[in-house]
């Protein structure tokens, strides 16, 4: 049981720590929102999406989904469109004006964009299937539950912590220069993921 828990925690950390579109977006909204509670929608959405992907990976459902070419192509196309739009929305925001309410995205956009970088990112989905889904096959019964639950808990703690750190950075950035740089970097990372998806889509068609 203890081994399954440690395995789940380390595995989840290994997958979630690298700089990616999802992490960048959560951090960005933590920094941009005037109050921490303003970032709750993106935190909860990102964590819920990760929880869903982990469950699907452990249950083997996601593997079945990616064996359907038409569905895979549709996910790639929708994901590409969302990421391009999302990158543009973040790029054009102007936190340097010191009006963080203007720079921050609405709850609706936070939820929509968080879902797009989580559920419509083939790279993230394949990582979850290939690593967490495959690793879960080593366990059964209570150990499998502990392994799965541990990976989920790491996601929730990570996203709350990431947004909190972003909020502290945003509070310290009275001139708006750091937030401006964060927005530009965020948009570039998100567009980079979009290019990756576009290349994958090109190979499919």
What are these regions (language model features)?
Residues 12-16, 51, 118-122, 152-160:
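Residue-level hotspots within the lipid-embedded alpha helices of multi-pass solute transporters
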Residues 2-73, 130-146:
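Juxtamembrane transmembrane-helix termini in multi-pass membrane transport proteins
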Residues 8, 12, 110, 114, ...:
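Helical-face signature of the major facilitator-like transporter fold
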Residues 112-128:
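Selected transmembrane alpha-helices and immediately adjacent juxtamembrane segments
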